[in-house]
């Protein structure tokens, strides 16, 4: 019997999502205006934030752009925020959006080189612990110069490459045959082998993701909010690194040691070994590629390596905004490697654009948080403390909010509030500088707890690889837990023990950094 029009509309609504999920989103859309108009805009704002987090948590049931987008459109429509505020948020974060559009696409054209390097890593080194440490430290190093999103895009590209090679061969095809690696119906696949390989890839992706947080917190180009904090404090690349180092260096060592421990003792879903048969396929693929590599192919790798040098130099010296450097990577890589037809170019943008749209929706929710002043009580409470305790409170408050909200937003809001406190004479300039360190480390480190806080984690969760290797929201939170605990505690101990203040004094005495005055930043442009 044919469905009625109302039934057909319900079936079409959010597509293949479970019925309970569709009902939940519909309930949210009914409840929100009632709360806003008849209870309190403040309560409605926090409920909206929780609902949006729910859509992110259910990313594998339905991509968050649609349900989150509906909630955001309604929020603007009923007056929780305004279209101009949403546009202002997007303008303030344009660099992040350009980064997603261009840098991620640029990395797509460097995949051959990356696959070559990481394949060598996996095929030449048999110890899982050493491979894990290599992926974690390589991600940390790269994230100090590249944005964490760029690095995670690299690792995702590598993981998809490995997965598709294995899937193709295990499905009875040769390396050169066309194949759909997302197909779940292939009969030749050995399920136990496939599950073990999925677990192995999950381990490497999570170690890499944590690595991006460990490296990303250290420098002003590592994360988008670092750029905003550095701009407000008028710090250059070297000074930013030195001021952060009393917290970031102990955390880096602790993070790498945690990577070793979880692999050694096979806890929290780590310790999965690469099956022998899969290792053989990847080794055979590497040998096949090496033996069939023409001079043309070799020159492609050389060009990609040179572009990689330009990429790191351009970002480290901040020669242009991140997105524009990404655009230059696209142009150079395609021009010198002969990729000139539009269809081939288009594929590079498929991975990043849905996430770019999702981030724009995210900024609408940020608009609600700002307009309804949802974080104001927390910030005023934190400013009520003094001295070292104030630093600890700011670190913890930042950390808790970064676990549930985007850390770019949290860092931006806090640094502006602290700057306002400096301008009104509530705090000294030296205390402002210490608070900037507490805010930066607080937004970057505890936020690894959930995909909501780290844009790189959210990108991983909503990427094409996540469903293939069964990486769900809950599993990411569980696998990140040992890191969350260690990074958060080591970070707070570095501040609470007075180590940050003492080491900062040493840096002043040795004249590696200088005392700034409040006048320096009175003219700085506010991020929001």
Swiss-Prot record:
Annotated InterPro entries: Na+/H+_antiporter_NhaB
Disulphide linkage map: none
CC annotations in GO: plasma membrane
Keywords of the record: Antiport, Cell inner membrane, Cell membrane, Ion transport, Membrane, Sodium, Sodium transport, Transmembrane, Transmembrane helix, Transport
Catalysed conversion reaction: 2 Na(+)(in) + 3 H(+)(out) = 2 Na(+)(out) + 3 H(+)(in)
Subcellular location: Cell inner membrane
The keyword Transport is assigned to this record: yes
GO MF terms, alphabetically ordered: sodium:proton antiporter activity
Keyword hit for GTP-binding: no
Membrane topology: Multi-pass membrane protein
Residue ranges of the TM segments: 28-50, 67-87, 98-118, 140-160, 240-260, 305-325, 350-370, 391-411, 449-469, 476-496
Family membership noted in the UniProt record: Belongs to the NhaB Na(+)/H(+) (TC 2.A.34) antiporter family.
Cross-referenced PANTHER family: NA(+)_H(+) ANTIPORTER NHAB, TRANSPORTER ARSB-RELATED
Function in brief: Na(+)/H(+) antiporter that extrudes sodium in exchange for external protons.
Name under which the protein is recorded: Na(+)/H(+) antiporter NhaB
């Amino acid at each position: 019997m044919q469905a009625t029009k109302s039934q057909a509309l319900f079936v079409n609504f959010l597509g293949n999502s479970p019925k309970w999920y569709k009902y939940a989103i519909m309930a949210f859309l009914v409840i929100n205006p009632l709360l806003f108009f008849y209870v309190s805009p403040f309560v409605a704002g926090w409920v909206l934030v929780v609902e949006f987090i729910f859509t992110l948590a259910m990313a594998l049931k339905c991509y968050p752009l649609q349900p989150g987008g509906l909630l955001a459109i309604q929020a603007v429509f009923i007056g929780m925020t305004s279209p101009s505020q949403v546009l202002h948020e997007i303008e303030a974060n344009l660099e992040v959006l350009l980064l997603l559009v261009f840098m991620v696409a640029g990395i797509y054209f460097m995949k051959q080189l990356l696959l070559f390097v990481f394949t060598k890593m996996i095929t030449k080194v048999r110890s899982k612990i050493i491979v894990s440490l290599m992926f974690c430290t390589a991600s940390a190093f790269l994230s100090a110069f590249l944005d964490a999103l760029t690095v995670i895009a690299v690792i995702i590209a590598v993981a998809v490459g490995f997965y598709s090679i294995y899937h193709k061969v295990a499905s009875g095809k040769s390396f050169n045959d066309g194949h759909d690696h997302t197909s779940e119906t292939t009969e030749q696949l050995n399920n136990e082998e496939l599950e073990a390989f999925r677990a192995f890839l999950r381990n490497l992706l999570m170690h890499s993701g944590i690595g991006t947080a460990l490296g990303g917190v250290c420098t002003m180009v590592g994360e988008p909010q670092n750029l905003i904090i550095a701009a407000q404090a008028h710090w250059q690349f070297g000074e930013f690194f030195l001021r952060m180092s009393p917290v970031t260096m102990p955390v880096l060592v602790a993070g790498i040691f945690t990577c070793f421990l979880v692999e050694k003792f096979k806890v929290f879903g780590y310790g999965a070994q690469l099956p022998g048969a899969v290792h053989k396929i990847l080794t055979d693929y590497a040998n096949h590629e090496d033996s069939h590599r023409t001079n043309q192919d070799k020159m492609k790798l050389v060009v990609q390596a040179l572009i990689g040098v330009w990429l790191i130099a351009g970002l480290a010296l901040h020669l242009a905004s991140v997105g524009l450097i990404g655009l230059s990577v696209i142009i150079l890589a395609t021009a010198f490697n002969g990729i000139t037809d539009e269809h081939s170019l288009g594929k590079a943008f498929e991975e990043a654009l849905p996430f770019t749209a999702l981030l724009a929706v995210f900024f609408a929710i940020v608009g609600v948080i700002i307009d309804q002043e949802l974080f104001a009580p927390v910030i005023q409470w934190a400013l009520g403390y003094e001295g070292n305790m104030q630093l600890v409170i700011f670190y913890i408050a930042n950390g808790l909010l970064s676990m549930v909200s985007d850390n770019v937003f949290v860092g931006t809001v806090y640094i502006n509030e602290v700057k306002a406190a400096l301008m009104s004479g509530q705090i000294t300039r030296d205390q402002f500088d210490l608070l900037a360190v507490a805010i930066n480390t607080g937004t970057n480190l505890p936020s690894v707890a959930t995909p909501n806080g780290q844009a790189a984690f959210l990108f991983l969760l909503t990427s094409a690889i996540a469903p293939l290797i069964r990486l769900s929201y809950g599993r990411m939170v569980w696998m990140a837990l040992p890191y969350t605990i260690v990074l958060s505690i080591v970070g707070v101990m570095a501040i609470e023990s007075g180590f940050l203040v003492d080491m900062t004094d040493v840096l002043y005495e040795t004249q590696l950094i200088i005392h700034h005055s409040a006048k320096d930043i009175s003219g700085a442009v506010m991020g929001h």
